[in-house]
């Protein structure tokens, strides 16, 4: 697969649409110009389920891949290689690239090259006040006066050419913010279960969950706790459901929460969120919040787009 992608139009994917992301071996070699965002790409790929290694000498790539794939069973690997690798390794990239494809298959190995326009790179280095790798003479950080920044950027293009010419995908980050970069990478590599909705019932008397994205207080609803025959039951029991059936406000509140979540949860997906936690709280976390959490799970699972997972947990279950 050879796709050079510098525009926003086409969006090549590294996986077959009919194949599960987790079932396919995906070895992604990520290289590119200093300041173009290669490290950000590796961090995003790690968030997307890749085992990421940055600044790996090219000569060690075959050994690292073999250990990760054969010894650890890891199937999604992103290896960052850049100008800091020994120069002899760069000239030997073709042989390393071919050996990986022979060992793991043509479709398993992809080279991604990250770049940016020269004026963008200069602006980024000036903004961060970092020194270009080719302007550093030794490990003490002494600046190499043989290169100014534009010259170092131009020289790096020449040195990385052995990798660049094998690029299956090129990403120009000049006009991309971090959110757009995330979206682009998600399109390239594919993501199983792109977002998980975690519904959590809890009791306010034991404290509010600190990791919730949304918290709904349902203590205004009728409380089965005050019915002696229902005190030992929970919101998962049929008799509690029958109790709530006599109160239309319970159905109305459940519907209102579902409407709100159906409206806004898809936006979290487009904002590159992987999980969203929705907490439903009553006094003790046994009746009202449990009942609504269970019914919300059923409602959302049927109404949200396919591929989203809705889970339900009850924080106070050990207290029942």
UniProtKB/Swiss-Prot annotation:
Keywords: ATP-binding, GTP-binding, Nucleotide-binding. It comes from the Bacteria. GO terms for molecular function: ATP binding; GTP binding. SUPFAM superfamilies: P-loop containing nucleoside triphosphate hydrolases (SSF52540). ATP binds at residues 32-39. Belongs to the RapZ-like family. Displays ATPase and GTPase activities. NCBIfam families: PRK05416.1. This is Nucleotide-binding protein Psyc_0118. It comes from Psychrobacter arcticus (strain DSM 17307 / VKM B-2377 / 273-4). The lineage of its organism: Bacteria, Pseudomonadati, Pseudomonadota, Gammaproteobacteria, Moraxellales.
